C-alpha cells in the first residue's frame, strides 16, 4: 500500500501522480477528507490510468448539529462543518471525471460502517485476482466437444484482457512433464495446493498425485 498523503494543490497532485506511477499501483482510493477542488485530483487520475475509487466516507453516521451550533464561534463551526463535507466534493469530482472520460466508482458511507470496509476489501480482492490472472500461466488440455458452442473460449481475448499466458497441451506432453517431476517437487506442490486451495477430503490421494 502506498500513501500519497494530503493532496491540496494541482502542483502536489502532479508530484503525487509521478510517485504513484513509479510504485506501479493497481488501484487508487481517493479519500475525500474534507471539501476539495477537483483540480487537486484530476492530474492524478489522468496520469496513472488505473481504477479510481472515490471514498465518499463521512466521519460519523450523522452530523451533531446541536454540538456544532453550540460552539459559539464561526471559525470553529466552519471547521466542524468542513470535517463532514465529503459529499460536497463528490459530485464535482464525478462531473469532471465524466467529462474527462475517466472511469471511477463511488463508495459512500461512514467510517465505522462495516459495509464500507467490506466494499474496500472487495475492491482489493478484485485487484489481487486481476494481478494473479496477469501473472498466470494456464494450460489447456484436449479439445472442445464438437457443436457445444456455448463453451468455446476466445483464448486470444483471454490473453490480451487479463495478460494470461496460455499453453496448449497434448496428453503426451502432459505425461512427459509429469514423469519429469521429482519427489521433492511433487511434495512441495502438494503443500502449495493445500495452502492455496480448499481440497475436498473425498479426493483420492492418487488423483492429487
Describe the role of every protein-language-model region.
Residues 1-209:
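An N-terminal assembly and electron-transfer interface module characteristic of large anaerobic redox
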